[in-house]
Amino acid sequence: MPERTIADFKRLLADQPTASLLAAAQADPRKGVQQAYQHYLRQAEKQAVLVTRFNQHMRLERDFWAHGGQYVAGIDEVGRGPLAGPVVTAAVVLDDHFDLLEVNDSKQLTAKKRAALMPRILEEAVAVGIGVADAQQIDQLNIYEATRVAMAQAVRNLSVRPTRLLVDAMQVPVPIEQTRLIKGDAKSASISAASIVAKVVRDHLMTMYDQVYPGYDFADNMGYGTAKHLAGLASLGATPIHRQSFSPVRNAKRV
């Protein structure tokens, strides 16, 4: 058998290498082979970290399934703090076939990574529900209660009825048993997936609002009170999507 080329090693190491191939790569003195081997080791280490984290994040769901539960929904929200735009919630039901290792708290992911994961979550999840509370509801109810209403809406919009909810530090007003978790999006894959879905949906809405209401930099700040947003408020006044109960919106003129 002819000696493997450096290109051969690079190709084979990138595709589930056998133990014998790894041993051959480790023993090969050529610089190019050693570089390819070290790259494989770094990638394997990263993959192992992802697998470990994923298994930790699936622990609550797997425990629920092991005790006879069928559908557990993770719920999260995005947009409680901004001065403008809705609060968006998502409820996501997974099963034991779910294997997106990169799913994590949406705040730990780039916009590009969230956008890439979103369709895969929608494809692999058993069910996904969305809830939205607009600025008017937020002003009428307060942000906490509006978020709870939106979470209940997300649960109702699921195509299956969950028998357990995993919620990030809130109580959802639905007659379903709930487990409240502090920083749940870092502890549950279902909540992490919900945080990604809610974030992508809300960012898309705010990007659309940026076209409707130019001058506030919504596509960049997503409604949060950045310097450009506050400058827009001062010069243009508040829009219909601004939360009138939030300072400094309260004293701004209306568009």
Swiss-Prot record:
S-S bonds: none
EC class: hydrolase
Keyword Lipid biosynthesis belongs to the record: no
Binding site for a divalent metal cation: 76-77, 168
Residue intervals of the RNase H type-2 domain: 70-255
Main location: cytoplasm
Keyword line: Cytoplasm, Endonuclease, Hydrolase, Manganese, Metal-binding, Nuclease
A Pfam match: RNase_HII
The protein's name in its UniProt record: Ribonuclease HII
Encoding gene (name): rnhB
